Amino acid sequence: MYGGTSVFQGNQTTHGMSDIYPVAQLYWSDRDRNHFMAYVMGGLPQGTYNSNNLANIGIGHGAIDVGGAYTYTNRKTYWEASATAGVTNNFMNNVTQYKSGVDSHLDWAISKGLSRELSVGIAGYVYYQLTADTGSGNTVGANKSRVLGIGPEVGYLFTRGDAQMPMTYLNVRAYKESWAQNRVQGTAVFAVLTLRWGQNNIHTFTPEKSVK
């Protein structure tokens, strides 16, 4: 909705390739419970995009995102909490001559490990646009958008061999969106598959050993 007028209406399903997001990350931690990360990520508009569609997988323009993250883990209780916050600067969409404003985003999750392999929890996100859209293709004025989502998450660690070496981690999240303004609202489902590469890329809970 904008100015009391519905800009888009209806439902649409879209399939295709996503954009490419190269990222540089820096991690550090106290090797126990507190873990930190800073990142810079670019957005390359290679995904499926059509300016006439209501739903698109690609965003149709380049972008650069900077931010950081914090994760707390407790190996005794199997609780984990994490949050990632960032700010994104969007570049001009050359198809529509429309430039989205600078936006902010927060993603968070709290989970409980039921076993070494299985964890369940709740996750959510908030998207809030800080500056209005611009460009010669902007026909709706000082447009700013927002949305939030919240829902369940499930994680499972696949292991191999008698030593139960962690090999693959699957995380599935489902979000019910609300608070939407100048943005589509619905239900979003994400599945992330992490493959082992090296020794320490997959975090697992292991019981702490007492020192005598």
Question: Language-model features: where?
Answer:
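Outer-membrane pore/translocation modules
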Residues: M1-G101, G141-S145, G198
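Outer membrane beta-barrel transmembrane domains
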Residues: N94-K212
